[in-house]
Curated annotation (Swiss-Prot):
<dbReference type="InterPro" id="IPR031311">
    <property type="entry name" value="CHIT_BIND_RR_consensus"/>
</dbReference>
<dbReference type="InterPro" id="IPR051217">
    <property type="entry name" value="Insect_Cuticle_Struc_Prot"/>
</dbReference>
<comment type="function">
    <text>Component of the rigid cuticle of the larva and pupa of Hyalophora cecropia.</text>
</comment>
<protein>
    <recommendedName>
        <fullName>Larval/pupal rigid cuticle protein 66</fullName>
    </recommendedName>
</protein>
<dbReference type="InterPro" id="IPR000618">
    <property type="entry name" value="Insect_cuticle"/>
</dbReference>
<feature type="domain" description="Chitin-binding type R&amp;R">
    <location>
        <begin position="18"/>
        <end position="90"/>
    </location>
</feature>
<keyword id="KW-0193">Cuticle</keyword>
<keyword id="KW-0732">Signal</keyword>
<feature type="signal peptide">
    <location>
        <begin position="1"/>
        <end position="17"/>
    </location>
</feature>
<dbReference type="GO" id="GO:0042302">
    <property type="term" value="F:structural constituent of cuticle"/>
</dbReference>
<dbReference type="GO" id="GO:0005615">
    <property type="term" value="C:extracellular space"/>
</dbReference>
<dbReference type="GO" id="GO:0031012">
    <property type="term" value="C:extracellular matrix"/>
</dbReference>
<dbReference type="Pfam" id="PF00379">
    <property type="entry name" value="Chitin_bind_4"/>
</dbReference>
Amino acid sequence: MLVKFVACFVFVAVASASDFSSFSYGVADPSTGDFKSQIESRLGDNVQGQYSLLESDGTQRTVDYAAGSEGFNAVVRKDPALIAAAPYITAPYGYAVPYAYTSPYGISNLANYRALKFASALPYSRVFF
């Protein structure tokens, strides 16, 4: 019985060690300036991949990473971006207000406003709990 259990355990370990999966995606939107990509592959318990994105300062950050039985390791690089920045769009002309603004309620008299007397609901003390 023990031999069957050990043999079954070995077959499961071999089957899980040969599992392979991978994925990748990318986004390139020049109107918003969103440029990023990622690729990752997994073989058994070992994962390795890379992702990159365009940062707000105009550089491209690239991270190469690997994870496995020896731990997680990442290498980060910052390179100048080869993608031109989105152009600044200006309005063709300024907007002129056709009339001066006046309040529909008239001018308020701020001299009538004053601070109201206020009493604390609980007396203040210097005792701290």
